[in-house]
Amino acid sequence: MYGVILDKIDYEPKLIIRDIDDRFQYKISYAKAWRAKQKVFEMRFGTYEASYDNLPHMLSAIVQRNPGSAADTYIVPSLDGGPGFLLRAFFCLGACVRAFMYCLPVLCIDGTFLTGRYKGTILTAIGVDCNKQVVPIAFAFVENENTESWYWFLERVKIHQ
């Protein structure tokens, strides 16, 4: 079932229940099917926690592989001297920054809330080209939409434009 679940990203727990019953004549609960799907994704892609831990490394790889790209993180130090925790992450791709030179001289900014396991806000800066097409410029993951996080984001957008 591991391969089937991976092949069908939108494989719903109710379909897992049906397929287990058809294949093995065994009934499982919805909760068990949900946990099985989560476990398969963790085995293949890692945990949510590991993804957040790897974010600074992934951003570094983006900057190294994409000329003109930029990234920054804000990590809050731990009180006990251990590793801190990621509070904010910013990135912009070099190609998008260069494309902004050909956009209308207006920068549109917006934020939207994350509603999954980890809360927070995604802040975005976009431009509009002469064909009225949206050009993404920069993104940031922040703790919430407040004056301090907006200032942090816009300061980085200004530096990297």
Residues covered by each model-derived region:
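DNA-binding interface regions
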Residues: 1-161
